[in-house]
Amino acid sequence: MKREVKFSLVFRDMWQSAGKYVPRVDQLVKVAPAIVEMGCFARVETNGGGFEQVNLLFGENPNKSVRAWTKPFHEAGIQTHMLDRALNGLRMSPVPADVRKLFYKVKKAQGTDITRTFCGLNDVRNIAPSITYAKDAGMISQCSLCITHSPIHTVEYYTNMALELIKLGADEICIKDMAGIGRPVSLGKIVANIKAAHPDIPIQYHSHAGPGFNMASILEVCEAG
């Protein structure tokens, strides 16, 4: 049986490399029509920590910038998503709970559909409040498994974490292979295990290309569901 695979466009190196202080929002909105015209992306990352930092460095209002950047994608029926650092929100240090709760309402009002929440420690306790806040704001809560390779980080470890996040209310799971070092076969097994328990839960795979595993990993996770 054929399976539909959807693609998400995620920007990273523009913000987290030596040239991270570009582009401005006026440049982003010029790029948006070309992305839409490509016709291959179901989702596009439009805001999150990296974006807001760039806006502020340029003296731009992040509220206006995010609205301008999400608008063309919504008009084309493309969902928008953002990155959320759990207890840290969009920052690199913890944010009070009341600020985090308000943050989701603001993001929803700006036009953000999905929040991808991750904790670098894979501590579900840090992610749990984000699930509640996102859903209360009317957003889709996508929770991440931060992938690495070690004797501790086994297929069973990640499967159990995913099942716990789904039990807490996560709408989707992201296999966040942040360094691209996840082993393709192991990633496929993680996806298969999640799908066996929750066939209808959407799973998104996020990879980096550096180590060279990502194309094999993409094939494995797609084959697994």
Residue locations for each model-derived region?
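A structural motif
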Residues: G39-F41, T112-I114, A170, D200
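N-terminal amphipathic alpha-helix/helix-capping segment at the start of soluble metabolic enzymes
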Residues: M1-A18, V66, T70-K71
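Conserved, mostly hydrophobic/aromatic
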Residues: M14, T117, I173, G225
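Short glycine/serine/threonine-rich phosphate/pyrophosphate-binding segments
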Residues: A18, R100, V124-I127, G212-A216
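Catalytic cores of alpha/beta
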Residues: E156-L165, P211-A224
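Active-site/ligand-binding-proximal alpha/beta "capping" segment
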Residues: A18, R183-I203, E220
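Active-site beta->alpha loop and helix N-cap motifs at the rims of alpha/beta catalytic domains
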Residues: P33, G48-I166, G180-P184
